[in-house]
Amino acid sequence: MSRPQRISVLGATGSIGLSTLDVVQRHPDRYEAFALTGFSRLAELEALCLRHRPVYAVVPEQAAAIALQGSLAAAGIRTRVLFGEQALCEVASAPEVDMVMAAIVGAAGLPSTLAAVEAGKRVLLANKEALVMSGALFMQAVKRSGAVLLPIDSEHNAIFQSLPRNYADGLERVGVRRILLTASGGPFRETPLEQLASVTPEQACAHPNWSMGRKISVDSASMMNKGLELIEACWLFDAQPSQVEVVIHPQSVIHSMVDYVDGSVIAQLGNPDMRTPISYAMAWPERIDSGVSPLDMFAVGRLDFQRPDEQRFPCLRLASQAAETGGSAPAMLNAANEVAVAAFLERRIRFSDIAVIIEDVLNREAVTAVESLDQVLAADRRARSVAGQWLTRHAG
């Protein structure tokens, strides 16, 4: 290798970004940070810039950029600080960049992720909303540009590892019967149904196995996360919703499975640590040390599986329906969920209201065809508006 590969980490201060930079730091001969971006944790971004000395840093606003530029200059760091969405797209698509970690949470990450794809980069996709919102457009851009798209979600990474290399020829053609998408069931898997309305944001964010941000923790608690992953799996692996089955697996040791027509089931197992799928995607088709401890099968002891309870997890049903409907439905589902989760974290609504808001939006808004990014973003805006109207009527 003549030089280290340059990586832009979009969402560097989040859990995925920090895990990515941990892998970068373990392999300075292989990787170096080209650009780091942050949204609200600007002190953390400054610390990361001091440690990794990227060429660029990106923040949301000009005032923050001026402040960070001054701090870094005073420390003798020559990182150039940019601001705004256009800057995100620029560092995602810059000619010097070899790979992009797309880890900005939610719809906000779509434009920069798409910019990386259109520039033909190796894209490490942690932003599931990009595929949920604009699946057909996104995958068309991948094929058109020749980008290498590698999934970072532990489940999709596990599926990728468990499929044959020629899966793009068609799942049935390569002998796949179905994809088994595992889910921990979150912190409320066994909570009495009558208590779900009164659970707190703190309880929802206390995931039993994974360390995650607040939004994705709530999505895991409602199993909307798994619903979004079902939609993502359909686009990544050219599967029909009927070919993807969600299985609750409380230990989070099996990260997903592929069931073949000959009766074989191939699975990927490992400790629940995002550095495993991140390092796999960074080094693919090679493998490198991720810093993750080996899996102790004797300590695991047993593996349990359950069917999801639709009464307990209505968000999973809504996501499955959106996947079947297609068009703008997944984008509206995602937008309504983002609004509802934010309101729950602000204690404006109950946990059980999240699914109510999403269903209200899907019932009120007509599904349209999606043929451009503008149409995707328009559907997103409409859904957010309808969800906001629900909050105005019902929330504090």
UniProtKB/Swiss-Prot annotation:
One GO biological process term: isopentenyl diphosphate biosynthetic process, methylerythritol 4-phosphate pathway involved in terpenoid biosynthetic process
Enzyme Commission number(s): 1.1.1.267
Keywords of the record: Isoprene biosynthesis, Manganese, Metal-binding, NADP, Oxidoreductase
Enzyme class: oxidoreductase
Catalytic activity annotation: 2-C-methyl-D-erythritol 4-phosphate + NADP(+) = 1-deoxy-D-xylulose 5-phosphate + NADPH + H(+)
Pathway: Isoprenoid biosynthesis; isopentenyl diphosphate biosynthesis via DXP pathway; isopentenyl diphosphate from 1-deoxy-D-xylulose 5-phosphate: step 1/6
Protein name, UniProt field: 1-deoxy-D-xylulose 5-phosphate reductoisomerase
Organism: Pseudomonas aeruginosa (strain UCBPP-PA14)
Gene: dxr
